Amino acid sequence: MTGRAAQAAARRTAVALGLLVVLAGCSVNLPGTSTQGSGAVRTETRSVSGFSAIQLAGNGDVQIEQSGTESLTISAEENLLPLLTSDVVNNELRLGVKDGARIDTTQPITYKVTVRELTGMDVAGNGSQTATKVKTGSLRIRMAGTGSITATGTADAQDIQMAGSGTYRGSGLTSKTATVKSAGTGNAELAVSDSLDVNIIGNGTVTYTGSPQVNQSIIGSGSLQKK
């Protein structure tokens, strides 16, 4: 090996070792430890009120029904229940995990929510929300990550914003107008009668039914398809 080649090899080795040190440091400095689920599932009812939107951060499945009441039940492993949060902030029920806590589930986390009028659904992470019997003036959809949202019923207007590779299944929710902004590889399905505005950056797909007036802007390999 020539002197120049040896120096290059030494530099590569030094860089590799440096990366290992950085990675090792990152792994040592991760805050907290993960709490393993016990496997024993318990259902807990919590008192909630004054909300019309639901946000889920992390994993779990939220089942929402629009009715004349406001309620929340959580089914999860009993040792994880104290770590699950359910706070109402600015008219939004926020479901997640306590700050600094990390959980490792062996059984699904299921939230059942009833709400008087549903105006917003928000998923951050790989969780899911499903809403039935929706009847509202405007429904706001926010997605970040790989999660999914499904909605059925009626809404005068929909405002949908997606980032990541999530899926919005709104073909069972009829609406007059809809606005969709998608960045990433997400997929959205919806039913619109009057007007549809679509802005796609990336290779996401928006599929719609109905005969609305369509305005579209697509940057990348994304697509807008009429079903």
Region locations from a protein language model:
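Short acidic/polar N-terminal linker immediately downstream of export determinants
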Residues: T2-L81, E92-T114, S223-K227
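Extended, compositionally simple hydrophobic/Ser/Thr-rich segments
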Residues: E44-T45, S52-I64, I103, T110-V113, ...
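Conserved positions at the start
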Residues: L81-L83, T146
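ATP/nucleoside-binding phosphotransfer catalytic cores, i.e., glycine-rich phosphate-binding loops
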Residues: V89
